[in-house]
């Protein structure tokens, strides 16, 4: 609990950790790095006595456990890819903050090329497949010419009348898979990829780029990590920027793209 962390009850927390069995779930109510340091001290003591744990955490946990010092935000120098091709930004999130960030990003029209992925093609026979093919072809031409491409899904929500929640979910998954496949079908290596949205960025990394192992380079902005893709991935040695949907200010996406193009 937060009280145990605040009074620095390392021994008491360690005893709780030692008593956990059969994949018991342990929830840590830490609200600061100071709280996390207390918990990690107890965790290390428990691990030294032979206990093993599987952690599902945010980045703060690995920072404290690894005793990683604060690092400056990454800049253009560290994010330069090994190609003169343009980059690609893929925006799948529909939350209001993402839409506001997209509208702000459009101020770079002329410096980047914007392409809207028509999600309503999901209702046409082979519509999504054709839309993916169209988008990939156009994007590759721009990337090869050194231009950065911004691909975003139509902002309207598709919710036809009389459609069940299960049917809506099925459509949502089909669209999400189609959007992710754009990266998977690219035959040219972009100098960077930015994926916007929690599900979008996860699927692009694991499914489209087939990343099994990556080096975490740091953050380009607060809460926005950057991977350097591994040798086994579709595009080895490329900066991959993971931008969750509800993170950043209205201008954050524009600032990142502006620095990279």
Language-model segment annotations:
Residues 189-190, 195-198, 202-250, 255:
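Active-site histidine-anchored catalytic micro-motif
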Residues 45-48, 62-63, 134-141, 149, ...:
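Catalytic cores of soluble, metal-dependent hydrolases
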Residues 78-87, 91-177:
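A glycine- and small/hydrophobic-rich beta-loop-beta segment
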Residues 1-36, 261:
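Cap/lid and interdomain-hinge subdomains that line or gate substrate/regulatory clefts
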Residues 1-2, 26-30, 53-58, 63, ...:
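General beta-strand structural signal in soluble alpha/beta enzymes
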Residues 23-27, 52-54, 86-88, 146-150, ...:
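Residue-level preference for the first positions of well-ordered beta-strands
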Residues 24-28, 32-36, 40-50, 56:
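Active-site pocket-lining segments that scaffold enzyme catalytic pockets across diverse folds
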Residues 57-84, 218-240:
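Short, flexible loop segments at boundaries between secondary-structure elements
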């Amino acid at each position: 609990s937060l009280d145990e962390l605040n009074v620095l009850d390392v021994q008491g927390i360690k005893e709780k950790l030692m008593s956990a069995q059969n994949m018991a779930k342990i929830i840590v109510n830490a609200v600061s790095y100071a709280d996390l340091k207390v918990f990690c001290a107890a965790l290390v003591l428990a691990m030294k006595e032979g206990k093993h744990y599987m952690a599902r955490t945010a980045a703060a946990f690995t920072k404290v456990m690894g005793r990683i010092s604060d690092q400056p935000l990454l800049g253009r120098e560290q994010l330069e890819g090994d190609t003169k091709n343009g980059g690609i930004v893929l925006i799948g999130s529909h939350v209001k903050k993402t839409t506001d960030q997209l509208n702000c990003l459009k101020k770079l029209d002329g410096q980047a090329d914007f392409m809207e992925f028509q999600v309503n093609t999901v209702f046409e026979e082979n519509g999504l497949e054709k839309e993916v093919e169209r988008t990939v072809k156009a994007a590759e031409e721009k990337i090869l010419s050194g231009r950065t491409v911004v691909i975003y899904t139509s902002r309207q929500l598709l919710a036809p009348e009389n459609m069940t929640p299960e049917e809506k979910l099925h459509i949502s998954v089909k669209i999400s898979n189609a959007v992710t496949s754009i990266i998977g079908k690219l035959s040219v290596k972009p100098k960077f990829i930015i994926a916007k949205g929690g599900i979008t960025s996860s699927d692009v990394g694991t499914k489209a780029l087939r990343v099994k192992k990556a080096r975490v380079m740091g953050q380009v902005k607060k809460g926005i990590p950057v991977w350097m893709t591994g040798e086994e991935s579709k595009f080895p040695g490329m900066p991959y920027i993971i931008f969750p949907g509800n993170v950043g200010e209205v201008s954050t996406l524009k600032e990142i793209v502006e620095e990279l193009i």
